[in-house]
Amino acid sequence: AFRRSEGLFVVEGARELLHCIHSGYEVETMFYCPEILQAYDGAAEILALAREGVGHEVSAKVYGRMAYREGTEGVVAEMRAKHLGLADLRLPKDPIVVVLERVEKPGNLGAVLRSADAAAADAVIVCDPLTDLFNPNLIRSSIGAVFTVPTVACTSEECIAFLKERGIQILTAQLQDSSLYYDTDMSRGTAIVMGTEATGLTNVWREAADAHIRIPMKGTDLKGKVGLLDFH
């Protein structure tokens, strides 16, 4: 609660921190252990930043007590949050957008962001989220993709209006009344919309859809299905 009220979030790990910094986020405070950090790519850049006055050197023992998880590459930083909205998205012609409704588990959202990053999706829009976009578990599971893929949160109604105004077709992933995803033309601007693994999409999305698609995979693995659709 304090972190959110102050507009701050925590990043652990050299890779995640560099993704964050390169995406324009400001370091508020940083704690680092050179003994651990120097073994990782990007250590020189992080140490140079630390010497500018935002870094505090700590021993391996102290760092071990501070770190949220093991193997975090010797650095943990408190960052200043940036809350992007739909108006901040700069989409190319015929974009691929991933839309997630009411996602609850930070680890799942992080994995979806990782898949979206690997597939070069142009944006991820999280509608009516039940988790914080700067949750430490989300940042960790995304391996920093939450900073490299434009990611915004909004209501489902706002997102639908945004997509319709830009002529981006809405494809909802669902089992009922749907066609196989590979029979659908995704060469134009496309938003792939998925709900939670437990309950799927709400009616507001089913009714707004231009087409309903399904993915012939056993189980309800949301992150796997997003990855498959993005690569298609």
Task: List the predicted regions and their residue ranges.
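N-terminal positively charged helical leader segments and presequences
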Residues: 1-70
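Glycine- and other small-residue-rich loops at beta-strand/loop junctions that grip anionic moieties
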Residues: 9, 101-102, 127-128, 152, ...
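RNA substrate-binding interface of SAM-dependent RNA methyltransferases
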Residues: 22, 47-48, 59-61, 83-84, ...
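Short, acidic/turn-prone active-site loops that include or flank metal/cofactor-
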Residues: 35-37, 61-62, 129-131, 197-199, ...
